[in-house]
Amino acid sequence: MKELVNILDFLPEELGEKIKPMFRVKQIYQWIYQKYANNFSDMSSLPKDLRLELARNFHFSPVKCVKNEQSKDGSIKYLFELIDGLRVESVLLPMKEEKIDAEGKRISHARYTICVSSQVGCKSGCSFCLTAKGGLKRNLSAGEIVGQILWIKKQNNIPYERRVNIVYMGMGEPLDNLKNVSKAVKILAQNEGLAISPRRQTISTSGLAKQIKELGQMNLGVLLAISLHAVNDELRTELMPINKAYNIAAIMDAVREFPIDQRKRVMFEYLLIDGINDKLEHAKELVKLLNGIKAKVNLILFNPHEGSLYKRPSLENAIKFQDLLSNKGVTCTIRESKGLDISAACGQLKERAKEQ
C-alpha cells in the first residue's frame, strides 16, 4: 500500500511542482487552512479527478488529539499522537483583551496564544525542565508543527483571520530543529493559509549561538526569546548543560547580530528558582549583562513538577527582582503561569505515556 505524504509539509511553491495549475494550489491551501476542510472530498471547488488524486497521494492529519485538559484559568493542554505513535503536548492560552471603540465603549474579546512543540522530547538537559527527563526521540516535521496549530484553531472554532500568537516554547529546542521550524514559520505566514505573520511568531532557544546566527541570516522576521535563567557561566552550566557548548558571552554576541524590528525587543526568559538565582545581586548582574541590548526580561516563577528538588520563590521576592531591573531601565514583566493546575505551564510538558 502506498504511503501517503503529509500535505501540511509543503509550501505553495513546492506543492505547485506536483499540482498544476498554480491557482489550484491556492484553492487547496484555502480549503485546508481557511475553510478547515476535514478531507479532500470536502473541497467542492476542485475538479473530482483532482480530489481523487489528492486522496491517493496525501493526507493532512499528521497529529491526532488523544486527550485534552482545561485549566481553571481557561488554558487547554492537548496531548497529540503522531503517526508513529510518539506523543507531544501543546497549549492554547486564551486571554481577554479590552479595547475602546470609536464611540468610546469598552469592548472585550479573546486573544489567543498557541504554544507548540518542535521535538518529541529534548536533548538540552535543563535541570528544571520535565521535557528533558526523557531525552530526545526525534524532530517534528514542519507539517507536524503546523498540524498542532491547525487542529487547535479548528477545534476551538477560531476563524483563520483571527490573529493568534505562536510561541515555539513547547517540547524541544526549536533551533535544534531549525530547518523544519523555519519552514513551519513560512507555511503559517502564507496569505492563502493561516496568514500568521512572522512578527506574531516567537522562537525560544536555550542559547544555541550558532543557530541563532543562522536564524538571523534567514531574515524571517520572527521574534527571538532566549532562555537565560542565570547571569554567570558556572550557575548556568549547572542549570543548563548546553552552556558548556555555548556560554553566555557567545549567546550575547549572537543576540547582538540578530536582526529585529525597531519596535521590538529580544525577550530574555529568566526562571526564578528559590535560593538559586533569585537574589538581588543576580538582578544587578543581569542589568550589566543586558547593557546595550534592546531587551525585555520575562520573569517566570519556577513551576514545580514531580521529581524536582527546586522550589518556587515567593511573589514578593519576584517583585523585588522586577523592581530592581525596572528602576535600572530594563523592561521587565512577571509572567502569569497559566495552566499550572494541569501541568501545562513552563517546564511541565512531556511525552505522556500511552496508557494515559
Curated annotation (Swiss-Prot):
Pfam family, one: Radical_SAM
SUPFAM superfamilies reported in the protein's UniProt record: Radical SAM enzymes
Keyword Cytoplasm: yes
Keywords annotated in UniProt: 4Fe-4S, Cytoplasm, Disulfide bond, Iron, Iron-sulfur, Metal-binding, Methyltransferase, rRNA processing, S-adenosyl-L-methionine, Transferase, tRNA processing
Subcellular location: Cytoplasm
Binding annotation for [4Fe-4S] cluster: 122, 126, 129
Misc: Reaction proceeds by a ping-pong mechanism involving intermediate methylation of a conserved cysteine residue.
Record EC number: 2.1.1.192
Biological processes per GO annotation: rRNA base methylation; tRNA methylation
InterPro entries on file: Aldolase_TIM (IPR013785), Elp3/MiaA/NifB-like_rSAM (IPR006638), Methyltransferase_A (IPR040072), RlmN_N (IPR048641), RNA_MTrfase_RlmN (IPR027492), rRNA_lsu_MTrfase_RlmN/Cfr (IPR004383), rSAM (IPR007197)
Protein name as annotated: Dual-specificity RNA methyltransferase RlmN
PANTHER family: 23S RRNA METHYLTRANSFERASE, RADICAL SAM CORE DOMAIN-CONTAINING PROTEIN
Function: Specifically methylates position 2 of adenine 2503 in 23S rRNA and position 2 of adenine 37 in tRNAs. m2A2503 modification seems to play a crucial role in the proofreading step occurring at the peptidyl transferase center and thus would serve to optimize ribosomal fidelity.
Family the UniProt entry places it in: Belongs to the radical SAM superfamily. RlmN family.
One cellular-component annotation, GO: cytoplasm
